[in-house]
UniProtKB/Swiss-Prot annotation:
Binding site for ATP: 15-22
Cellular location(s): Cytoplasm
Chain ranges of the Guanylate kinase-like domain: 8-188
NCBIfam families: guanyl_kin
Keyword terms of this UniProt record: ATP-binding, Cytoplasm, Kinase, Nucleotide-binding, Transferase
Gene3D superfamilies: Guanylate Kinase phosphate binding domain (3.30.63.10), P-loop containing nucleotide triphosphate hydrolases (3.40.50.300)
Enzyme class: transferase
Record's keyword annotation contains Translocase: no
PROSITE patterns assigned: GUANYLATE_KINASE_1 (PS00856), GUANYLATE_KINASE_2 (PS50052)
HAMAP family per the UniProt record, alphabetical: Guanylate_kinase
KW Glycoprotein (keyword) present: no
Name this polypeptide is given: Guanylate kinase
Family affiliation: Belongs to the guanylate kinase family.
Amino acid sequence: MSQDLNSGRIVVLAGPSAVGKSTVVRRLRTDVPDLFFSVSMTTRDPRPGEVDGEDYIYVTREQFEQNIAADKMLEWAEIHGGLQLSGTPREPIEKALAESRPVLVEVDLEGARNVKKMLPQVQTVFLAPPSWEELVDRLTGRGTETQDVIERRLQTAKVEMASQSEFDHVVVNDDVDKAVAAISEILR
């Protein structure tokens, strides 16, 4: 393990699909000076408006598996019942920490567990919806997924919601400004 990963401030953000992680991350990237946001690598297709290399690094399953084999991933997981692979590239985080920048890593539940296991000093944040009903409304209201995908994401969300006590911090996203302020404090 690189010494760079054992020093510096790393905040790991997780939460269910449609809880507003992307919105909160976008705001944090503008509001927190010097913040390094670790762009996750994924095998899922981009949603409308998402930019490769900015929102996610979009790759094929084969490319993702090559990165795993070459030990280029800090963590990775097969998520939503095998629907996609998603993970965190290692090198950009090492570089940001070497530059003494705070690091924000957005991952799923397994990713948060894996990073915490490898780097116990990280602060984990669970971004929670105001209610289950609100989460279902947000997910179905996006209009970007099929009913089958929505059902899988809701199944995953049930497991994630039941696991929030594992996190160092729980931030309820009923107001984006308040959620951003709370996570900004944790990053300081």
